[in-house]
């Protein structure tokens, strides 16, 4: 086991504080509409430029191990805030820095660290309750646009694209961000349920000019099995042919004479038919087939449920207004499933998302949720260079997370105003002793830090602006972009309540742990043995010289 370097008390805290300040100072320059860029060196390729707090935090590693521990603990604040709300990483880092700096001053002055932490926690609990009272619902397109615009660093085009995407696919719909091919940002919406499986034979194509299969008002047969024997399918094929409607077959696989028979029937015009493989694998395939059956109002023909393909009737088949099949994808539009069945399935998937432990499972469940609830929107980010593309894509993803958080828990006045108002409302809060009161004051002082930094980044005097904002009421605040005072909601400067709440809670949690730190332990740096061994022969030779 390697030897350890151990530091205690004030010596340990000073080292830790240096690390906290290095990381926080690098992150906080990005805050606000006039925040600056940070250039990150890469081991290969061009440097990347970002205004995203968590991207900056992730890049920072310090040489001194004790200082690095402080930096890594603040990095945890940014990561946790990012995981919880997808935004607010810079605010969280700034709050943590302020609490740690003020808290450690109090510890150095002889205050009890545990009581300080209790005071900070008490202030944060009260502040979160006040934030909930200040919060207003964010449901209309205008408010969503404003939140997206603020989070994308005042890029109105991004804000309006996100609002348009949410309008088209619903608040629960999946919105993905991709790198575009042009200079302009684009929004592409895929309505209905789409999955990554194309036609099993190009002979099914009935739109040769576009190379796709289109079926109008088709029946949909779903089978959780391989189909290779044509006899199994004959009864249902005859029933569909009599109805005059087209047929889509979704099965684990379709091969041999069964596929050949379908192709021949389709080419002769006896029955308009197409076949695709079921999406997913294993249990996920079963679940997705069940989703499709609920969406289309049919049943999955499954041997596990003692259902046989030969005995299936038209009542077992699903229906949709339209199906479009390309080489790689199948899209089912306008399924005729019952609304309440679809809603109960959506509720079930939401429950599974809450219980899921892995990010991969959550991602796949969210995809299924979106396909059932309305569709998928793809935001294609346009830029002139690859460096700009990466920076812009990170901003758009932040803005998307922020708007989702806003829809979930509502919005409060932005620009650091909400925390200043909350601090004003709980200014009379008291703890059980004077040390706890100091902890409360540390937290209240920290709540001004985001506003002060936004003002500082815009080139104005933080104390003057902060006092002016404190003298105002309600949503009255400072618009750093235009250098004007007024109602932040009217200015369109909004912050999601969830983002502000998460930033405050995670900052206080980690900062409280740092204030109560008394000892730090790390590995001693290893000595370079090669330099010692290289010097010994010279010493020996010197000795021989002396003997002569």
UniProtKB/Swiss-Prot annotation:
It comes from the Bacteria. PROSITE patterns: CHAPERONINS_CPN60. It is found in: Cytoplasm. CDD domains: GroEL (cd03344). ATP binds at residues 30-33, 51, 87-91, 415, 479-481, 495. Residues 524-548 are annotated as: Disordered. It is an enzyme of class 5 (isomerase). Keywords: ATP-binding, Chaperone, Cytoplasm, Isomerase, Nucleotide-binding. InterPro entries: Chaperonin_Cpn60_CS (IPR018370), Cpn60/GroEL (IPR001844), Cpn60/GroEL/TCP-1 (IPR002423), GroEL-like_apical_dom_sf (IPR027409), GROEL-like_equatorial_sf (IPR027413), TCP-1-like_intermed_sf (IPR027410). NCBIfam families: GroEL, PRK00013.1, PRK12849.1, PRK12850.1, PRK12851.1. This is Chaperonin GroEL. The lineage of its organism: Bacteria, Pseudomonadati, Pseudomonadota, Gammaproteobacteria, Enterobacterales. The gene is groEL.
